[in-house]
């Protein structure tokens, strides 16, 4: 079992937390992580760019001049791609850029990203995090207690509840900070049969230097990925 220190919200060590080796301490597969990030970014592409061909541009139905005896080049329409204000030849059209990735590769990529952060010593486990109000000052005090000023930090929280929502909102005005509530509608601490970790993704883990997990979130990750 891998072991990390367990902290409270004041940045004080209060114990240790065991992490499953098959999730947090595997040999990172960088190829699979790259494939996951490529897959994830492909889902963000709107694919709505569109250009008009010569047949779609308004006008140009009349031949600009007769075919012969003018001394000029032959043209059939002023909307030809070689004309100003003409249509576009071989231009982009709306398309679906999304890619597919097998479930096993998604799991392996998540495990690899978590293991990479563990090997770097950048996983911080907190017994619990919660704010009574969504104020930037609360978050600044928290990151100061841990000595993380100027770091890119990803907070991953397990359940939808007001204290966690306040943590998420408190991150918004501080560059480099992001909070994810890795939950799905209907999931609760008591109802583990439908537990998922929606929102937890490889791109965000790799895009932030520090990964802060609550104790419940560690248990949830091990339940889903185990």
From Swiss-Prot:
Record has Nuclease as a keyword: no
Residue ranges, annotated region (Disordered): 52-71
BP term (GO), one: translation
GO molecular function: rRNA binding; structural constituent of ribosome
Record keywords: Ribonucleoprotein, Ribosomal protein, RNA-binding, rRNA-binding
Pfam family of the protein (one): Ribosomal_L4
GO cellular-component term (any): ribonucleoprotein complex
Domain of life: Bacteria
Family to which the UniProt record says this protein belongs: Belongs to the universal ribosomal protein uL4 family.
Assembly and interaction partners: Part of the 50S ribosomal subunit.
UniProt function note: One of the primary rRNA binding proteins, this protein initially binds near the 5'-end of the 23S rRNA. It is important during the early stages of 50S assembly. It makes multiple contacts with different domains of the 23S rRNA in the assembled 50S subunit and ribosome.
Full protein name: Large ribosomal subunit protein uL4
Species this protein is from: Pseudothermotoga lettingae (strain ATCC BAA-301 / DSM 14385 / NBRC 107922 / TMO) (Thermotoga lettingae)
């Amino acid at each position: 079992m891998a072991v990390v220190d367990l902290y409270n919200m004041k940045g004080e060590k209060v114990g240790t937390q065991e992490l499953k080796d098959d999730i947090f301490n595997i040999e990172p597969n960088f190829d699979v992580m790259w494939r996951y990030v490529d897959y994830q970014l492909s889902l963000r592409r709107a694919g709505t760019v569109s250009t008009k061909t010569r047949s779609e541009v308004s006008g140009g139905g009349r031949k600009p001049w007769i075919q012969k005896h003018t001394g000029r080049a032959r043209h059939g329409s002023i909307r030809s791609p070689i004309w100003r204000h003409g249509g576009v030849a071989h231009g982009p059209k709306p398309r679906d850029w999304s890619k597919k990735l097998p479930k096993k590769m998604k799991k392996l990529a998540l495990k690899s990203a978590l293991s990479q952060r563990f090997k770097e010593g950048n996983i911080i486990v907190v017994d619990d995090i919660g704010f009574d109000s969504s104020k930037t000052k609360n978050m600044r005090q928290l990151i100061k207690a841990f000595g993380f000023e100027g770091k890119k930090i990803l907070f991953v929280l397990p359940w939808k509840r007001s204290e966690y929502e306040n943590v998420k909102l408190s991150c918004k005005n501080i560059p480099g900070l992001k909070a994810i509530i890795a939950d799905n509608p209907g999931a609760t601490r008591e109802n583990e049969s439908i537990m998922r970790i929606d929102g937890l993704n490889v791109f965000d883990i790799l895009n932030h230097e520090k990964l802060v997990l609550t104790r419940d979130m560690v248990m949830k990750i091990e339940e889903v990925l185990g």
